[in-house]
Amino acid sequence: MALPDFTMHQLLEAGVHFGHQTHRWNPKMTPYIYGQRNNIHIIDLAQTVPLLHQALKLVSDTVARGGRILFVGTKRQASDIIADAANRSAQYYVNARWLGGMLTNWKTISNSIQRLRKLDKILAAEAQGFTKKERLNLERDREKLNRALGGIKDMGSVPDLIFIIDTNKENIAIQEAKRLGIPVIAIIDTNCDPDNVDHPIPGNDDASRAISLYCDLFARAALDGIARQQGAMGIDLGAQADAPVDPVLENTAPVSE
């Protein structure tokens, strides 16, 4: 059993250290900013590394106790990656528009999920007894529901822990989690408010390579938790070749308070 391994070199290669343009920053991110280069804030990866490791351990521990992890990322570049990571690790996801009340009005959401299940059953039987037009309408309804709720169809209840890409875009999800006392792990870019989440991880939340790296690590942490829960042997997920060191940090000016 082992948590997924990663190196600072991998974070650099994925562009995790690149923040937003300096004029688009949130001053609350000052403690997590190493400096700036060409009017771009550079994130302090020396802080990202331990915070990411702690978050991975939390995911593994939560799953090992039988808890459910909800992956949330509805922006275009995160959508497919989020779904793949959740599916690969037997967890749950929201990768289309977050529907208000997805957590705080779970009863209503559950009714919609039951409707989705019913449509699945009807269409699996080739919608016998329905006209062609009625079948098309049923298929459209199912597609719409599946896009919104397919990733949480089997969740059964609200999650025990939420992992979020882009706290600005997913603010409603964060507020609902707060109301229910559900802890939130989130990637916080230099334009985000780190105070909004329980477990902030400073990092680029826009680059596909960075998002892929985060999601892969968290999926593997969840799988480690499943292995621990089942009492199985873990798989050594380290032993990856170091990526070249990005020279950007050598030419970075310190950020002013």
UniProtKB/Swiss-Prot annotation:
Q: Does the keyword Ribosomal protein apply?
A: yes
Pfam families with a match to the protein in the record: Ribosomal_S2 (PF00318)
Q: Which Gene3D superfamilies match?
A: Glucose-6-phosphate isomerase like protein, domain 1 (3.40.50.10490), Helix hairpin bin (1.10.287.610)
Q: Which cystines does this chain contain?
A: none
InterPro entries according to UniProt: Ribosomal_uS2, Ribosomal_uS2_bac/mit/plastid, Ribosomal_uS2_CS, Ribosomal_uS2_flav_dom_sf
GO molecular function: any one?
structural constituent of ribosome
GO biological process, alphabetically ordered: translation
Keywords attached to this Swiss-Prot or TrEMBL record, sorted alphabetically, are: Ribonucleoprotein, Ribosomal protein
Q: Which domain of life is it from?
A: Bacteria
Which GO terms of the cellular component aspect does the record hold? Answer: cytosolic small ribosomal subunit
Would the keyword Ribonucleoprotein be found if you checked this record's keyword annotation? Answer: yes
UniProt similarity note:
Belongs to the universal ribosomal protein uS2 family.
**Which NCBIfam families does its entry note?**
rpsB_bact
What name goes with this protein?
A: Small ribosomal subunit protein uS2
**From what organism does this protein derive?**
Bartonella henselae (strain ATCC 49882 / DSM 28221 / CCUG 30454 / Houston 1)
